[in-house]
């Protein structure tokens, strides 16, 4: 394994030590001053009075800083070449999204009826285009669409000289976007998909079938995702899909309209409600979503992750398949919303996929120059907090308490399996020892059908099916377990093994109850508690805790 050789005279241990992080922050500030003196002065002014910026000023500053954070991290970890290669992949895909918006949506399909599009000779047009763009027979759709977009972008530079090929391209785009055969051919692509209007009462596409005299609704068969065993069934969007969504976003923080983050408001300031009565409050963390989308669309994945980590440092436990309050409050209320969770998760995965990617993400949860209010962990306070429950609430609270300088002991009723001491820094007996940097995140990944139930994560461990990659729980666990101010104990029941009086007798200054709601959401339908009828939460808990999943 290649050893980690950090720049600026820092060691790996410095990244987990407050004094080392202070030196790191000074190195970044000097790096910024050398590269952009005016931006450096803006950062220093903002750190002195972060609330004086206002929302718009803070957004502009973070977006401007993000590329510099990315360059600094690439140099710090010695992966500048890999970071530039990741940026290049983003830039190579850029024509897809500009051509989709400016040519396909605004020209090719405008005013064209579906019947007229279906009458076009799509296969014949495709053969002509294959010759013009140099596509080979059987070429994969993402690559074909990229070739098409690159050529159309070049042809648009001189529309007069390229009128004939642009007309051909426009007719093909209309066929591919509007006709049933075209939509089927490009079902796995992004270029010829336009946002659809939303019918809130028919959000899931279904078809009507009749079987044995009974009329029923079902998902169209070509949308079925077959599950065999307990392997991961949803790997999420790839880079093409995530950037498609990031470019679909109109980056409305520029107008102060980023309702995905701040919620949709009525004129009186109250939050709007959906047709189902759901409050459209946006992201509970007020994550800077629009800013993330803009920076990601510009090709800066590390910079985008740094923006996410300001408000949502434990983003490994959010995103795709976990939460969608942001989507519900998206400014697009009458058409498909931006798939924000996909963008967030893809951004994290792109960083984790770099050499030392886990260490970069981990570092941003402790030191984040874009966090104007707490760029560094605060000095130790000597205060001790007992966190009851290691589900999403417990582990997120524990993280923030540690960064505020407190000591945290966390307990959970589930048995928590130990991790190897060389990656966790904790031996089986609970003693601390040095741990190794992780170069390749694959070292932390297990197949979900082979994965041992680790016990960490609460409801995220036992209540979520294999549509979500539970390897993220190991990543979250390591963010905490490697911290010297944190200890956790499984198989401890609050109120039994330890009581509130016992906790204070042990010297804890505060007890935080993060044990969950305790009761399931009961669906209000007749006979819902009849024998043989199980609530989803009850079924999943029994499935996971009895080992039936294995």
Spans of model-derived segments:
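Ferredoxin-type iron-sulfur electron-transfer modules and their immediate structural context
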Residues: 2-380, 428-482, 513-532, 537-540
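Predominantly flavin-linked oxidoreductase catalytic cores and closely associated redox partners
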Residues: 548-550
């Amino acid at each position: 394994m290649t050893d980690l050789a950090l720049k600026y005279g820092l060691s790996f241990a410095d990244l987990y030590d407050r004094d080392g992080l202070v030196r790191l922050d000074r190195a970044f500030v000097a790096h910024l001053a050398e590269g952009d003196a005016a931006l450096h002065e803006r950062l220093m002014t903002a750190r002195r009075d972060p609330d004086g910026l206002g929302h718009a000023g803070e957004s502009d500053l973070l977006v401007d800083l993000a590329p510099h954070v990315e360059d600094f991290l690439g140099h710090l970890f010695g992966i500048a070449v890999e970071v530039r290669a990741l940026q290049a992949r983003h830039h190579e895909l850029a024509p897809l999204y500009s051509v989709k918006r400016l040519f396909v949506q605004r020209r090719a399909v405008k005013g064209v009826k579906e019947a007229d599009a279906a009458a076009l000779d799509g296969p014949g047009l495709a053969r002509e285009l294959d010759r013009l763009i140099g596509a080979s027979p059987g070429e994969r759709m993402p690559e074909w669409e990229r070739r098409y977009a690159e050529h159309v972008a070049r042809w648009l530079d001189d529309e007069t000289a390229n009128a004939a090929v642009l007309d051909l391209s426009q007719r093909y785009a209309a066929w591919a976007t509007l006709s049933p055969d075209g939509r089927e051919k490009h079902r796995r692509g992004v270029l010829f998909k336009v946002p659809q209007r939303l019918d809130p009462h028919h959000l899931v596409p279904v078809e009507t079938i009749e079987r044995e005299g009974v009329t029923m609704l079902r998902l169209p068969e070509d949308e079925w995702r077959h599950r065999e065993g307990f392997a991961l069934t949803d790997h999420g969007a790839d880079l093409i899909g995530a950037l498609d969504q990031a470019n679909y976003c109109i980056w409305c923080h520029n107008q102060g309209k980023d309702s995905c983050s701040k919620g949709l408001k009525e004129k009186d300031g109250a939050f709007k409600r959906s047709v189902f009565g759901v409050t459209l409050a946006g992201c509970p963390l007020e994550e800077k979503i629009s800013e993330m989308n803009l920076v990601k669309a510009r090709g800066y994945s590390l910079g985008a992750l740094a923006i996410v980590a300001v408000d949502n440092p434990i983003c490994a436990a959010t995103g795709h398949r976990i939460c969608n309050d942001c989507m519900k409050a998206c400014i697009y209320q009458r058409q498909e919303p931006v798939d924000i969770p996909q963008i967030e998760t893809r951004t994290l995965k792109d960083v984790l996929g770099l050499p030392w990617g886990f260490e970069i993400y981990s570092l941003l949860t402790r030191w984040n120059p874009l966090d104007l209010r707490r760029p560094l962990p605060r000095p130790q306070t000597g205060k001790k907090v007992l966190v009851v429950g290691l589900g999403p609430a417990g582990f997120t609270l524990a993280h923030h308490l540690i960064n505020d300088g407190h000591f945290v002991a966390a307990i959970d009723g589930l048995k928590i399996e130990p991790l190897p001491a060389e990656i966790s820094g904790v031996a089986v007996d609970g003693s601390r020892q040095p741990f190794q940097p992780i170069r390749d995140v694959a070292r932390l990944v297990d197949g979900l059908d082979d994965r041992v139930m680790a016990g960490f994560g609460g409801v995220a461990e036992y209540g979520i099916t294999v549509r979500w990659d539970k390897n993220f729980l190991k990543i979250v666990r390591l963010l905490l377990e490697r911290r010297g101010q944190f200890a956790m104990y499984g198989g401890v029941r609050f109120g039994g093994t330890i009581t509130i009086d016992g906790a204070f007798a042990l010297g804890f200054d505060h007890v935080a109850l993060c044990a969950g709601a305790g009761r399931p959401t009961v669906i209000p339908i007749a006979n819902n508690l009849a024998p043989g009828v199980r609530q989803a939460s009850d079924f999943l808990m029994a499935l996971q805790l009895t080992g039936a999943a294995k």
